[in-house]
C-alpha cells in the first residue's frame, strides 16, 4: 500500500492574503520598533526614581517571644500616701495621693487607678520628690467621692 500524500494547509483566500501582504509592506516601511520621543533632561542631577520596596518576609522571628510588660497596673501604683496633707487633699479637693513608679506617665497612672479601684479620674498631677519617688495627685470625677474611695481602699 502506497503512503498517503500529506494534505497541506488550505491556502488562505485572496482577500486574507492581500491584507497580510499589505500589513507586511507597512511593517517594512514603518519599522516594527516603536519610536519613543526622548525626554529632554533639564537638570544636571539625576534623581533615581522610587522603586517598589517589598515587605520583608523573614524565615523566622528574630525574637522568640514578645517582651513582657514590666510596667503593669500593679507595678505602676506602689501605695497610697496617708500623710496629713494627703488627707487634707482627700477632704477638700476630692483628690487621692499615690506614690507611683518613676517611669509611669499620667495616662498610665490614670488607667491603673481606673482599673484597680473602678473609679473615674478627672485629671492627674505628678511630681518627683527629692528622694526620687514620683507622687501622683489623682483628682476624681465629680460623681465619685474621694473620702468613700479612700475608705474602701483602706487609707482611712
UniProtKB/Swiss-Prot annotation:
Species the sequence originates in: Homo sapiens
Keyword Phosphoprotein: yes
GO cellular component assignments: cytoplasm; cytosol; cytosolic large ribosomal subunit; cytosolic ribosome; extracellular exosome; nucleolus; nucleus
UniProt induction comment: May be down-regulated by GNL2 (at protein level).
Biased composition annotated in UniProt, kind: Basic and acidic residues: 1-19
Primary location recorded for the protein, binned into one broad class: cytoplasm
UniProt modified residues of type Phosphoserine: 43
The record's note on its domains: The N-terminal beta-like import receptor binding (BIB) domain mediates interaction with IPO5, IPO7, KPNB1 and TNPO1.
Per UniProt, location of the Glycyl lysine isopeptide (Lys-Gly) (interchain with G-Cter in SUMO2) cross-link in this chain: 14
Function noted in UniProt: Component of the large ribosomal subunit. The ribosome is a large ribonucleoprotein complex responsible for the synthesis of proteins in the cell. Binds a specific region on the 26S rRNA. May promote p53/TP53 degradation possibly through the stimulation of MDM2-mediated TP53 polyubiquitination.
Keyword match Ribonucleoprotein: yes
Modified residues (Citrulline): 41
Name the record gives this protein: Large ribosomal subunit protein uL23
Modifications made to the protein after synthesis: N-terminus is methylated by METTL11A/NTM1.
Location of region: Beta-like import receptor binding (BIB) domain: 32-74
Location of this chain's protein in the cell: Cytoplasm; Nucleus
Modification type Phosphothreonine: residues: 45
Basic residues bias: start-end ranges: 20-67
Family: Belongs to the universal ribosomal protein uL23 family.
Gene3D superfamilies xref list: 3.30.70.330
Any one GO BP annotation for this protein: cytoplasmic translation
Segments of this protein annotated with the region Disordered: 1-67
